[in-house]
Amino acid sequence: MAKGLIGKKVGMSQIFDEQGNIIPVTVLEVGPCAVSQVKSVENDGYEAIQLAFQDIKEIQTSKAEKNHLAKAGLGPKKVLKEFRSFGDSPTAGSVLKIQDVFAVSDVVKVTGVSKGRGYQGVVKRHGHAGGPGAHGSRFHRHPGSMGANSTPSRVFKGVKLPGRTGSQKTTVRNLKVVRINEEKNLLFVSGAVPGTANTVITIEKI
């Protein structure tokens, strides 16, 4: 069985526990995912399951990917991801649903692409303190001294500078599954998840 599934982010909400405490949750639409390939130690050197998610038009995929999916009896899919397997492996062409992999109280990690923030300065990008806020300062959100004196006479590699922020692959760990809606394939996890609504994400048990 696969250790995770593919899905997409729906948005954030909140639910109440038995004591009446508010729990902020992220709603994820997970699966159903079709098994496009089963890898074994004999053929591939390791055990894994490749899953396919979300139907697309035939023109949106390559010929190689189309033929690869056709071997499992599947049509064109938007996302292919590989997960390490444990226990009995399903057959190619079968479908894994949310209840096959996850249960309430499972601890998971979620990987997705974070929100893009565009070109940002060091205060927003790296959390620098900036300069004094007084009127006479003229130095509020600048990066400050970074090149030292005439001995290096340059800025070292790796210095935190302004630049494009976000839109990077990000993983959030130790999220707890608090609710599952099997009819609508919805998974409710405590806390925040990278990306905007409809961002494709992978959920994997830790």
From Swiss-Prot:
Q: Name one GO cellular component term.
A: cytosolic large ribosomal subunit
Molecular function (GO) terms listed? rRNA binding; structural constituent of ribosome
Where would one find the signal peptide in this protein? none
Question: Key word RNA-binding present in the record?
Answer: yes
What is one Gene Ontology biological process annotated in the Swiss-Prot or TrEMBL record? Answer: translation
Q: Does the keyword rRNA-binding apply?
A: yes
Q: Which Pfam families match?
A: Ribosomal_L3 (PF00297)
Per UniProt, the keywords (alphabetical) are: Ribonucleoprotein, Ribosomal protein, RNA-binding, rRNA-binding
Family matches, as InterPro entries: Ribosomal_uL3 (IPR000597), Ribosomal_uL3_bac/org-type (IPR019927), Transl_B-barrel_sf (IPR009000)
Q: Where is this region: Disordered?
A: 126-155
Q: List the disulfide bonds.
A: none
Q: Which domain of life is it from?
A: Bacteria
Which purpose does this protein serve, as stated in its record? One of the primary rRNA binding proteins, it binds directly near the 3'-end of the 23S rRNA, where it nucleates assembly of the 50S subunit.
Which proteins does it associate with, and in what oligomeric form? Answer: Part of the 50S ribosomal subunit. Forms a cluster with proteins L14 and L19.
Family statement drawn from the similarity comment of this UniProt entry: Belongs to the universal ribosomal protein uL3 family.
* Record's protein name: Large ribosomal subunit protein uL3
